[in-house]
């Protein structure tokens, strides 16, 4: 009897020990090479609080700001967002070879240039380096990352010209370079992207020159060139057969006759305000299902066409033109 009790007690203790002891195959999924790189990144950023969970004694697949592939257990996502973090993007980021998502966002103390080491990450699909104090040029090496579908470098201090080689990205769906200090013309190659046509966000820069003639065939879903120093004839961009929905060309120096422009039938938002556009509003605008319209602060004349959504917009959408009249403005004489 005593022997049986002793056996049961020993068995129970053994089960407790096995249950509380971590099993290496279950507790440590993270690839050791990836863990080493992540710890290097943490050290380079001076061990910020946002990365406090990056403990070398725990599985890095469970760390905050990272994700692992469910099959390979390699790090495929690094997202550092809105924390007290300072310094530069560490070169070690380029040593996470299976990374598909790279995000450093809303980090006002992140400085320096975008490191060339990122060019090694051939699996990248999404890059968001935005709302930081990154400076320097927009790197041309992004054109080597052929799997990119989303590139967001907005709200930074980037300067210099836009690399035309970005048009070589065959899968790009959206390009955000807005709210920087970029200069020079829009590359002619942007009218001929290698694959799908990305939504183009270039607003709040210091871009100058004319719209490339290649934009005659450019058909993005969204096109925002507002608040630059662009000039010339913008009418080449518009075509009734395009599928563009949102257009903002406001606060530039565009100068052309609006009278015969044929807007895309798909257009839902149009902002041409604060330019030097002359002529009259085309009658075909009454057929558009516009949700937003602003043509104020131009040199337009004539009667606002009656019909469609044109009378649903406020006075502010039309005022400060040369001699535009009709509802919602004053009656034509």
UniProtKB/Swiss-Prot annotation:
A Pfam family assignment: LRR_1
Membrane-related topology note: Peripheral membrane protein
GO CC annotation terms, alphabetical: extracellular region; membrane
Keywords: Cell wall, Disulfide bond, Glycoprotein, Leucine-rich repeat, Membrane, Plant defense, Repeat, Secreted, Signal
The LRR repeat ranges on this chain: 72-96, 97-120, 121-144, 145-169, 170-192, 194-220, 221-240, 241-263, 264-288, 290-312
Residues bearing attached sugar chains per UniProt: 109, 133, 147, 157, 241, 294
Main subcellular localisation: secreted
Keyword Disulfide bond on entry: yes
InterPro entries associated with the record: Leu-rich_rpt (IPR001611), LRR_dom_sf (IPR032675), LRR_N_plant-typ (IPR013210), PGIP (IPR051848)
GO biological process assignments: defense response
Cysteine-cysteine disulfides: 30-60, 61-68, 301-323, 325-332
Transmembrane region(s): none
Family, as annotated: Belongs to the polygalacturonase-inhibiting protein family.
Record-given protein name: Polygalacturonase inhibitor
Protein source organism: Vitis vinifera
